Amino acid sequence: MKPEPRTLPPSPNWYCSRCSDAAPGGIFGFAARTSVFLVRVGPGAGASPGAPPFRVVGELVGHTERVSGFTFSHHPGQYNLCATSSDDGTVKVWDVETKTVVTEHTLHQHTISALHWSPTVKDLIVSGDEKGVVFCYWLNRNDSQHLFTEPRTIFCLTCSPHHENLVAIGYKDGIVVIIDISKKGEVIHRLRGHDDEIHSIAWCPLSGEDCLSISQEENSEEPDIPNGKLIAETPITKGCYLATGSKDQTIRIWSCSRGRGVMVLKLPFLKRRSGGVDPTVKERLWLTLHWPKNQPTQLVSSCFGGELLLWDLTQSWRRKYTLFSTSAEGHNHSRIVFNLCSLKTEDGKQLLLSTSMDRDVKCWDMATLECCWTLPSLGGFAYSLAFSPVDVGSLAIGVGDGMIRVWNTLSIKNNYDVKNFWQGVKSKVTALCWHPNKEGCLAFGTDDGKVGLYDTCSNKPPQISSTYHKKTVYRLAWGPPVPPMSLGGEGDRPSLTLYSCGGEGVVLQHNPWKLSGEAFDINKLVRDTNSIRYKLPVHTEISWKGDGKVLALGNEDGSIEIFQVPNLRLLCTIQQHHKLVNAIVWHHEHGSRPELSCLLASGSNNAVIYVHNLKAVLESNPESPITITEPYRTLSGHTAKITSLAWSPHHDGRLVSACYDGTAQVWDALREEPLFNFRGHRGRLLCVAWSPVDPECIYSGADDFCVYRWLTSMQDHSRPPQGKKCIELEKKRLSQFKPKLKKKKKPTLRLPVKQDSSVGNEDESVKENSGPAENGLSDQDGEEEAQEPELPPSPVVCVEPVSCTDICSGFEKSKVTVSSKATSLKKEPAKEKPEALLKKRKARSMLPLSTSLDHRSKEELHRDCLVLATATHAKAELNEDVSADLEERFHLGLFTDRATLYRMMETEGKGHLESGHPELFHQLMLWKGDLKGVLQAAAERGELTDSLVAVAPVAGYSVWLWAVEAFAKQLCFQDQYVKAASYLLSIHKVYEAVELLKSNHLYREAIAVAKARLRPEDPVLKELYLSWGSILERDGHYAIAAKCYLGATSAYDAAKVLARKGDAASLRTAAELAAIAGEHELAASLALRCAQELLLMKNWVGAQEALGLHESLQGQRLVFCLLELLCRHLEEKQPLEVRGPSSIYHQWATGSEGTLVQRVTGVWRSAFSVDTPEQCQAALQKLQDVKYPSATSNTPFRQLLLHVCHDLTLAMLSQQAAAWEEAVPALLQAVVRSYTSGNFTLMQEIYSAFLPGGCDHLRDKLGDLSPAMAAYKSLEAFCIYGQLYEVWWSLCGPGPESSVWVLSAESTVSDKQSKPEDSASAEDMEQPPGPGPRLSAESERLLSACKELFSERHASLQTSQRTVAEVQETLAEMIRQHQKSQLCKATTNGPSRDEPSRDEPSQEAERAPSQPPSPTEERNAPVSLPELTRRLTEANERIAEFPESVKAWPFPDVLECCLVLLHIGSQCPDAVDPEMQQQAQELLHKYGHTRAYRRHCQSRHT
């Protein structure tokens, strides 16, 4: 059984009464998010020698929401069974050995809050929910019982260890009841005393009440009456003690025989070792209990700040307790403890395990009360991993819980030696980067845009940069300073500065010596240095080359830009990805092949990884930027976006990738082969890092809150999952914790959600379960981000575009506030029926209260008349009685003086407001003539109307201005932004109106207003176009975005955004647009991409039309012409099964007159007007700037054909221009591409079509002293090599062209007629000679020319190269075997020494075809490291002695040719010159000692 990968698990769930438990077999489990993690504890854990005896051994996966309860069965024979409860409403029973569900039930209708496996009944599981319902479930008989005792929220429950029918239940309000489940839940005791939540209940491990000598008098705080009402006398013969812990900061001991409390223990206020006591401690207290089985007189409890207390219950009057871990500083929990459970190990140790809010699981020795070990955990996504280049083995982990972990992965004494850093972070840590030279200097970036530096070797708080990113920090990198920071002397500036890339697309350069200073945006330097006029792309990734001379920037549009220091001059742009670039990594500098340091791997939101070789670009240092459209290697296999990449520091060209498909993949990038696939995560991978000390060890982090350490050789899979497996992984991911918060689409850039550090672990789990953060802008993949908890609905507040000014002297300046009850837009009234048109609704009365008072009884009306008469005819002032009457009869103000009338109108106005008719109140105020008061009151209440604003000019111009501004602000609260902008325009606030529309994403309206009211050259208009274009581009509306960029006179950006779609139509339109705008380089690159897309669709006509859009692509048109004719030629010779779209050929491609070369030159002359040497030379110069990577066996055939035709076009143009020294290397390059890709047929077609008469005429053209003579010899050798194989295969049976080589073939037809690979297999070499056919004269002439293949210099060079490769392979195998042996020693459940490891047979099987095994005694003979070093040194010295002319050009394998010739001689003895046979045998004898030819040579000699 292979060992489990080492795991940093998710944090145990918070605020659950029982979320961890331990079984007597040495298994401890704790609930974390939607799973349960299992930890093997004790000597049998299989931990490393000297390390603490524990190991994470597995995970129980099956719930879809948070696990709220976990309990083991403590009955002999079923220690492997456990039960879990979850917020998904299920209770599951598991087998921890198989990690599968045994059974489950969904009886609860509400959230389950408590769970326990009865310690006395082996198949009884009791659970309770938030509504007070208890279910008893008997596992063996699949039976259940429903109990509803109290309509209260259950917080915890515990079954009695002494009486099988008793269960103690604690409620949220502090009540504790003991029920008898055999009597339908009858309450035996109701225990009152606590006044807050019951967090934990623990039964005394001993039955009876003799273990504690507690008298009633001892409990001075308890009255001499029963604590709580005793419902009924219990028939229990023996009593028992019960302990309860509550949020009210007390522990109470209860007597079950008396039904009352006998002891109260108050938690002490301890001085926290990390600081003072938090005044809000009661709100955060969780008081959990554990009553040790072998210590009935002692009780363990948690305390305020994470301390653990051991209470001595025999001395209750002294309240005696002992603190855990009093001697060791920092070994206590730093925050409250939630769960305690005990475990007895195989060696007899009594341990206590605790889980806490500080995200640590701790193990305590009950004998010494000291901490034995700590298992750290993660409370958020693992966003970033980074190994320190100085302190090797220190792995920094950026986590979404607002903390940085530094894991010492090389610690011998502790496999989980982790330090936490949280000061100054306060948000999700999304990026990390160690300083390359300074120990302990760690840079970090967060989701709120913060960049800081931590000194991990000290306890100092971090330094924080004063310059924040507007969005999430996605990448950090240390690099050389660039202007303006690089200006000055050596001592005035740091040697390395910190670069950060944020989600808004900006890269900032920070001075680590002065983070309080301003950081610089490198875009300004890029723009100035390269004279860029167009909009710079949004940057999403940054990576410095190891030597610090080159910077790579990944962009949101999928492009990658390469810059050269010190001024960031643009060298080239890589146009390969079509979506946001998430990861860029340079190959390390310390490999055995220095040229590999120029490899750049990149991953994006597409599932394909591209590797580019920039060696030619960096060495040539082009004057103007070039565009690269072809990758050096393509790594395909993932099925989702790539999030992280890392090169192996131990291998050449080995890469590991992390992907959203839930797997990490190891690649051999040079061979384009997948090697190992890790599928241990249950979520989407976010980061990956290769161990700097172990070649097989890789660390990966994901959104499942886990970091795994895994070994490549222990993986069962070699490539990412495909087909149904992808669907299963997606279902598994979706089955995780389901968010309870409402999700909504975020209108801005993709960011991690900001979280509150005081929120519980489960709440954070909800937030973290949304899509993780990624570099740059969100892609159109339907992802949503969880938002912060929603607040009650409130009016939308707009950006304040106006400011209230004094309207006039004496008019008080008022602060306009709008009530949340602001009036909304009224809907248009429904159209009335025709018959109803005649019956209009009567207008509402302006003075309804006065009118109603005039319709009272006759007596009251008469009394009104008398009061009115008295008031009007009074000669002096009114007496008190008359004044009181007038106050009461306010409606008489209509008939008295103005003051009384105002009072009447005020009363009527209040009535209108109370009845919800403020417009009538406003009219009354207008009648009074108080227009300013009306406007001010309406503005304060948010009740301004169009009519009020319309009459505002009556009060003056300043009043009108103020009223319009206030009304516009009110309209913003009512989401009527367009109307608000119209009012702002009415007072000539054009800029404010435009800004209002823009800030509310009404770009179309804003542009219309700006275009109509502002000058055409106003920068606001261009900014509007660019802002709207960016948003449209982010949302995938590329065509409309292009219009915006065109409106902003940025045609370059318009063409770029159109091309982002990547289809042929979009690329063609973008190319045409760029050509119209005069962006010729961009037009050429887009036209070429369009032609390549059409090439995949076999649309040759469309491809030529696309290339014809730009004159500089004349050379590419010739390449595509040759490619079309070659494909047509191959189809005519070998008709293939038609798959996909049918080919659309030109008319000139259908003819068959003449040879292929004649047809090509004819079409060039007639269709493309390429006839003269000058024209050929011009086309040649354009094509020579295009470089394609070398081919491999995994190169797609269509891509191989394109590259081969490019080389053939160069050769033909060179011939027509009489440049023979360039023609021969180009022709050789085409042959070598076919040879290295393993396509022997294509290689032979090249010779038959382009060199039908052989290579002799090329020798005459070159001359013996030509520099290209070495290339000619290689070309001639490959020609003979191919013909040699055709002669050999023709001996096996009559093929289509066997008559050329064989006159009479008597041998039977065999499988050799099938298309062979580029070399003979071992079986072919070993075949006995058949009947001897007679070779033709042409064959004999060829065999006599084979002496050109028997080049001793090339044989010696190839042998030295094979020796180097074999030594390197042997060294790598020695390292692997050593690590495997160490792993087997350290892992008890690993493969035994007598059994071969899992991957050995596959390795032997892989070696079988190409590396035959050597003799047994030689294979088993060990080779020392000094001997291997000597062999390697000697081989490298021999290689260095060869002239460059020999090493520059490939040559057929000389020993392979010797073997083929000897086999032909064995079949046709008279056909091969004995002298040549002797020469071949001598070469084999002299140079055949390498592994590849050793067996063949020995069999040949024997």
From Swiss-Prot:
Keywords: Coiled coil, Cytoplasm, Isopeptide bond, mRNA processing, mRNA splicing, Nucleus, Phosphoprotein, Protein biosynthesis, Repeat, RNA-binding, Translation regulation, Ubl conjugation, WD repeat. The record marks 33, 284, 335, 359, 381, 422, 426, 470, 556, 579 as: Interaction with U4 snRNA. Residues 1355-1382 form a coiled coil. Residues 1380-1391 have a biased composition (Polar residues). Residues 825-838, 1392-1407 have a biased composition (Basic and acidic residues). It is found in: Nucleus, Nucleoplasm; Nucleus, Gem; Cytoplasm. GO terms for molecular function: mRNA 3'-UTR binding; ribosome binding; RNA 7-methylguanosine cap binding; snRNA binding; U1 snRNA binding; U4 snRNA binding. The keyword Repeat applies. InterPro entries: Beta-prop_GEMI5_1st (IPR056432), Beta-prop_GEMI5_2nd (IPR056424), G-protein_beta_WD-40_rep (IPR020472), GEMI5_RBS (IPR056420), Gemin-5 (IPR052640), Quinoprotein_ADH-like_sf (IPR011047), TPR_GEMI5 (IPR056421), WD40/YVTN_repeat-like_dom_sf (IPR015943). GO terms for cellular component: cytosol; Gemini of Cajal bodies; SMN complex; SMN-Gemin2 complex; SMN-Sm protein complex. The SMN complex catalyzes the assembly of small nuclear ribonucleoproteins (snRNPs), the building blocks of the spliceosome, and thereby plays an important role in the splicing of cellular pre-mRNAs. Most spliceosomal snRNPs contain a common set of Sm proteins SNRPB, SNRPD1, SNRPD2, SNRPD3, SNRPE, SNRPF and SNRPG that assemble in a heptameric protein ring on the Sm site of the small nuclear RNA to form the core snRNP (Sm core). This is Gem-associated protein 5. It comes from Mus musculus (Mouse). The gene is Gemin5.
